[in-house]
Swiss-Prot record:
Pathway involvement of the protein, from the record: Amino-acid biosynthesis; L-leucine biosynthesis; L-leucine from 3-methyl-2-oxobutanoate: step 2/4
Name of the protein in its database record: 3-isopropylmalate dehydratase small subunit 2
Function: Catalyzes the isomerization between 2-isopropylmalate and 3-isopropylmalate, via the formation of 2-isopropylmaleate.
UniProt GO cellular component terms: 3-isopropylmalate dehydratase complex
GO molecular function, one term: 3-isopropylmalate dehydratase activity
InterPro entries (alphabetical): 3-IsopropMal_deHydase_ssu, Aconitase/3IPM_dehydase_swvl, AconitaseA/IPMdHydase_ssu_swvl, IPMI_Swivel, LeuD
Amino acid sequence: MQAFTQHEGLVALLDRENVDTDLIIPKQFLKSIKRAGFGPNLFDELRYLDHGEPGMDNSKRPLNSDFVLNQPRYQGASVLLARKNFGCGSSREHAPWALTQYGFRAIIAPSYADIFFNNSFKNGLLPIVLGELEVARLFDEVKAFPGFKLNIDLERQVVIAPDGRELGFDIEPFRKYCLLNGLDDIGLTLRQADKIRAFEAERLARHPWLESRPVA
């Protein structure tokens, strides 16, 4: 998992509440459990004018020019500004997969659905909670100033606006540690590899029959 320490990125906005996981990545794209290939279908029903299905050549599909991610000013955005209850609906880890594979490193919103919030941390996506008034001001600024960027300093737990103001945010220490060090669940487990091997060797010495093999 890619570590997250500090990130400055162009901000794209999604000005709607209760964005559910089916809107983030529609159900027909959940047939694969590989963590690859979901970025082109992020917000599929909003980005394209036709109905998307797995295997379609997205480069030939008609784009919805009104959708923010299709507008030139938001190309290359890596910070998503959203409204409250982002990521609600069914549990699907494909949602943060699609967001990160598109290129987003962080989301800023007043609130999130719990499961999406937890899944985001496990996949290197930083979900930042700011107050509704702060988020509303950021929305106004993004709309008013093309090329609007934010600097996110995870170590200091602040979002820094272009005018220099700092917006603090909370994060659980363990989640912060994992993001700073690029550790997902597998990475955390591998840090204990020596202890795991020592335990397996001791168990085998005490209970050798547990590793017995059937006679051919």
